[in-house]
Amino acid sequence: MFSRDMTIASFDPELSEAMEAERRRQEDHIELIASENYASPRVLEAQGSVLTNKYAEGYPGKRYYGGCEHVDEAERLAIERAKQLFGADYANVQPHSGSQANAAVYLALLQPGDTILGMSLDHGGHLTHGAKVNFSGRLFNAVQYGVCPDTGELDYAQLERLAKEHQPKMIIGGFSAYSRVVDWQRLRDIADSVGAYLLVDMAHVAGLVAAGVYPSPVQIADVTTTTTHKTLRGPRGGLILARANAEVEKKLNSLVFPGTQGGPLMHAIAGKAVAFKEALEPEFKAYQQQVVANARAMAQGLIERGYKVVSGGTDNHLFLIDLVDKGLTGKAADAALGKAHITVNKNTVPNDPQSPFVTSGLRIGTPAITTRGFKEEECRELAGWMADVLDDIENEDVIARVREQVTQVCRRLPVYQQG
């Protein structure tokens, strides 16, 4: 028998200290990693609930275990809210991650050895879009498209040429480090011209899409995948959406379970359900509009300080800083900003001369700082602090000054307010 008074702190102080230290870090540091955000207390409550105890292999109404009537309702809520939020005809909320969602789609619609055409990791794509080190590049014949070297924008002409040359079974749209609007219909037209499926991985912009501030691919692509965190601000997890096609839906369901997963994580699905409800509220659109406004303010502030932003700006929640001309590596810049309590991630830039472990760029994202209340004014100020550090990364006095400025703004704009 368990007592509700049991705590980690009293039983496992080492783990408790690590957890508390991470809580303090999130409150005291500025978070600019584009794939990170802060889940609401409601989402955290769902993930820490008794639903974690329940095994529920199968789908609502068709489980392999008894006692699933209540978790069935939680999953049905998540499914219906996802469909409403994104205007989808089909939703599968069981994937444990975006990568698992992509794997299920590939295995549902392709055969090993088939050709896929996805965005190069070096140009802003994702590991699961055909990178050689990933299952997608090992199981399939992966051809990669990229961005124009002059503009930093997606090279549709190259994409179309590669599609005609290689006749892929699937074209993958979407990205992990691209700051402009993608023309989903143009990708659809290219896919149709070669008889390919179109899969869009909108993991990075799902929240923007849900709010109507970024074009939706859901009724254009055959299948759309996403994570449920990032801009969507839910629990870490995956989601598959599709337009009506009974044959495709059946294949997708069977490749999620039993094809690639066993029991779903019902506490995570409950977290998804409440996050989708939050995203259906009017204030979510205002939040996403602010995310984009903040990204644009930061990008412009850094450009004005002499820093090169790939493609010259942003239309979404992120942008890339190209440090080649500054003689800086992404690794060194990441470390210097980290000492000032500004958390970023080093990132490759198009035609990067450095290795992926060093890089020549930084990826900057605004979802997390917008959640804690940053507006354009704070973002312009933050861009200035970053430039101060990057202008002289060995100057400990500058780093100390910026760290104190970061502390002050974090105290003024906490992530989780008390009371």
Curated annotation (Swiss-Prot):
Annotated positions for site Plays an important role in substrate specificity: H229
Sequence positions that bind (6S)-5,6,7,8-tetrahydrofolate: L121, G125, H126, L127, S355, P356, F357
Cofactor(s), names only, from the UniProt record: pyridoxal 5'-phosphate
Substrates-to-products reaction catalysed: (6R)-5,10-methylene-5,6,7,8-tetrahydrofolate + glycine + H2O = (6S)-5,6,7,8-tetrahydrofolate + L-serine
First-listed, main subcellular location of the protein, grouped into a coarse class: cytoplasm
Compartments it resides in: Cytoplasm
Cellular compartments per GO CC: cytosol
Gene3D superfamilies according to UniProt: Aspartate Aminotransferase, domain 1, Type I PLP-dependent aspartate aminotransferase-like (Major domain)
UniProt keyword annotation of Acyltransferase present: no
Domain of life: Bacteria
Enzyme's top EC category: transferase
GO biological process: glycine biosynthetic process from serine; tetrahydrofolate interconversion
Function: Catalyzes the reversible interconversion of serine and glycine with tetrahydrofolate (THF) serving as the one-carbon carrier. This reaction serves as the major source of one-carbon groups required for the biosynthesis of purines, thymidylate, methionine, and other important biomolecules. Also exhibits THF-independent aldolase activity toward beta-hydroxyamino acids, producing glycine and aldehydes, via a retro-aldol mechanism.
Subunit structure: Homodimer.
Protein name in the entry: Serine hydroxymethyltransferase
Gene that encodes it: glyA
